[in-house]
């Protein structure tokens, strides 16, 4: 497991270890929630502090969950085109690294010069604690820099690598993930039906999914240019621009046909059924895309527009056109994919048992969604406590029609509270539903990483070297450490 925290924004991000099955992912997600709850309870009064597994913050930023899958970037002629594109990018990449090194060096000299001048001015005075020390300033190569200097350095780098990012974006759009975009985009447009967490906007309108409602591209970069693509390729961009500048190892890894790609349209939910359907159905669709040549797929006229439409359609009545003018509703699209994958699995005698369990759960969920009363006034009660957006909508609909927005918004927020007082947990206690993941599985996941994944090797390395004077630095793909003056690098292959 990994994580990060920005205490200035009260934001904690936590990640599951690499896993081999959808059930395993959900199990470690639930283990993460319990670990956070235990950490909070042991350090802060539970009546004064709480954790919210939210999809937005007080500043209006949309958060949600990012899922990472190993996908084949391209194959056949498209893979050759991908390689050629990467080779053509090498010269501008090297030029960028040279110019960027000069730029960072000049920023470092500027910082040292300013500090030297300030030091001369204060030699005749009694030394006073400085504000721009390591506790309040960022560092470049270990040297402290004032915030304005760091901002200037970062702004310059962004302008220097902007042409490379633009060229790499063209390569992605032209070559990368073509089968996935063609055959799976309609599924992702409708997926919020299964895994949306619900959202109440500032006008008291209820959305199925906050994250999916902001999708504006099929493929691209998210953090770099503030786009909200379905296929988020920021990890590839980081490899292209990765430091240290004298090494091309990360660049060379882009030639591998299998890359880690993020799907960035999912909400942060709590229902086990929602989470298992999200990961399980997505994994099946991606495998189906890469292993079949089925031409009978839905190709929507505008994928991003359809995704936004379905994300705001809690009554499940909106339809969107495909390229041939045929209209589809979200539940109809989901059924088409369900039938296609079920037919594909029928031809595979080696299909794992979990695949069929996901198919059964998927089909049951769609059948229960279809049981919505004709007046469209209430969500299906059978899915309350099992699908997040339906559960939250049901809670809000129990209020009087004249209830003020702030009371409804309180339900929207406290539904995600990770405590016994959270509204989801209270709902679960009331309904007494049988969990899909047992407490025994979750307890084990809190202590032991998956035995057949890089997380196992990473965890063993941390345990062995955490007490030694090894200067251990651990990342997702590799770790570096020193023993008896000898430097070592361990790589965690997936």
For the regions a language model picked out, list residue spans one by one:
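Terminal catalytic/cofactor-binding subdomain
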Residues: 1-52, 61, 86-97, 111, ...
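Gly/Pro-rich turn-and-neighbor structural signature
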Residues: 17, 21-86, 117-145
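Long intrinsically disordered, low-complexity regions that are acidic and Ser/Thr-rich
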Residues: 76-177
């Amino acid at each position: 497991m990994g994580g990060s925290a920005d205490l200035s924004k009260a934001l904690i991000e936590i990640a599951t270890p690499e896993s081999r099955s959808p059930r395993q992912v959900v199990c470690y997600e639930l283990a993460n929630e319990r670990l956070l709850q235990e950490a909070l309870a042991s350090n802060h009064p539970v009546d004064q502090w709480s954790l919210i597994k939210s999809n937005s913050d007080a500043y209006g930023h949309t958060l949600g969950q990012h899922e990472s899958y190993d996908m084949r970037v391209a194959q056949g002629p498209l893979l050759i085109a991908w390689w050629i594109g990467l080779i053509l990018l090498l010269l501008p990449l090297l030029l960028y690294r040279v110019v960027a090194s000069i730029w960072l060096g000049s920023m470092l000299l500027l910082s040292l010069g300013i500090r030297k001048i300030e030091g001369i001015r204060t030699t005749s005075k009694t030394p006073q604690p400085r504000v721009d020390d390591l506790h309040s300033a960022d560092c470049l190569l270990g040297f402290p820099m004032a915030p304005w200097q760091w901002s200037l350095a970062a702004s310059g780098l962004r302008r220097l690598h902007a042409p490379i990012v633009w060229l790499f974006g063209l390569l992605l759009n032209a070559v990368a993930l073509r089968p996935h975009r063609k055959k799976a985009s309609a599924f992702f447009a409708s997926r919020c039906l299964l895994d949306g967490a619900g959202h109440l906007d500032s006008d008291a309108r209820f959305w199925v999914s906050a994250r999916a409602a902001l999708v504006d591209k099929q493929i691209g970069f998210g953090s770099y240019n503030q786009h909200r693509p379905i296929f988020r390729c920021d990890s590839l961009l980081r490899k292209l621009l990765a430091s240290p500048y004298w090494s091309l190892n990360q660049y060379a890894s882009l030639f591998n046909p299998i890359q880690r790609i993020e799907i960035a349209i999912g909400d942060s939910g709590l229902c086990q059924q929602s989470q298992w359907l999200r990961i399980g159905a997505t994994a099946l669709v991606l495998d189906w895309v890469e292993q079949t040549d089925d031409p009978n797929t839905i190709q929507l006229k505008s994928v991003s527009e359809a995704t936004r439409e379905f994300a705001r359609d809690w009554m499940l009545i909106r339809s969107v056109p495909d390229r041939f003018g045929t209209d589809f509703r979200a539940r109809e699209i989901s059924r088409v994919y369900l039938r296609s994958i079920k037919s594909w699995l029928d031809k595979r005698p080696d299909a794992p048992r979990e695949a069929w369990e996901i198919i059964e759960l998927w089909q049951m969920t769609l059948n229960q969604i279809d049981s919505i009363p004709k007046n469209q006034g209430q969500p299906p009660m059978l899915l309350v406590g099992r699908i997040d957006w339906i559960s939250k909508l049901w809670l809000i609909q129990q209020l009087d029609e004249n209830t003020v927005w702030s009371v409804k918004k309180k339900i929207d927020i406290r539904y995600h509270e990770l405590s016994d007082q959270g509204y989801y947990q209270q709902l679960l206690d009331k309904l007494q539903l049988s969990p899909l993941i047992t407490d025994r599985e979750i307890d084990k996941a809190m202590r032991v990483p998956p035995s057949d994944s890089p997380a196992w090797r990473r965890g063993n390395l941390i345990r062995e070297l955490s007490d030694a004077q090894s200067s251990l630095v651990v990342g997702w793909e590799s770790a570096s450490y020193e023993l008896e003056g000898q430097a070592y690098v361990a790589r965690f292959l997936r």
